[in-house]
Amino acid sequence: MRFIHALLLAGIAHSAYASEKLTFKTDLEKLEREKAAQIGVAIVDPQGEIVAGHRTAQRFAMCSTFKFPLAALVFERIDSGTERGDRKLSYGPDMIVEWSPATERFLASGHMTVLEAAQAAVQLSDNGATNLLLREIGGPAAMTQYFRKIGDSVSRLDRKEPEMSDNTLATSEIQLRLLLWHVLWLKSSMAAH
C-alpha cells in the first residue's frame, strides 16, 4: 500500500511540475507575442544544469551582457595579483561615448580606479568605463580569449562600446548560462577546496 501511495505522490508531483513547465512556456510565448520579441531564458541549478528554459539554443545579440563577464575577468586579475582594484586608469574626453555617466563624472579628475570602472560598467552599463576596462585587458580579442578559457566556444567580442549594441554579434542562452555559472558558482566551489 505504501508503494501505491508513493507512486501516487510521485505522479502528482510530476504532473504539477509538467503543468508548471507548460505554464512557464505558455507565459513566455504570450509575452513574446505581446512585445513582438524573442525571449531567451535559462533557469539553472547550483550544478549548472538547466532546470527550465526557453530558446536555450538560439543565439541572441550580446549588447551589454558582456559587461558582467568583463568585470568577472577584471576581478579574476585582481584575485591573481595581476591587477589592483585601486589602480588609476587615466583617460581623456575621447573616452566619453554614448551613455557614459560615471566616466563623464570622473572626467575632471582624468581617471577612474579599476574598481570604479568595473562598478560603473556593471551597475550603470557605462560604455566609457567598459571601454576603459577593455583597453586594460587587451581589447575585445582578450575578452573572446577569456570566453574560450572558461569553456564558452560560442560567444565573442569584436568591438567596443557603443558598437556592441549592433545586433550582429551573438551568443546563446546556453553559453551565457555557462558563463554566468562559471563566474558565480564554479569559482566559489573552487575556493572552498
Task: For each feature predicted by the language model, list its residue ranges.
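Acidic helix-start/capping segments at beta-turn-to-alpha-helix junctions
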Residues: 85-102, 137-138, 164
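Mid-domain, small-residue-enriched loop/turn segments at the edges of structured enzyme/sensor domains
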Residues: 38, 131-190
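Soluble periplasmic/extracytoplasmic beta-strand elements of cell-envelope proteins
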Residues: 40-44, 69, 90, 132
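Beta-lactamase-like hydrolase cores
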Residues: 17-61
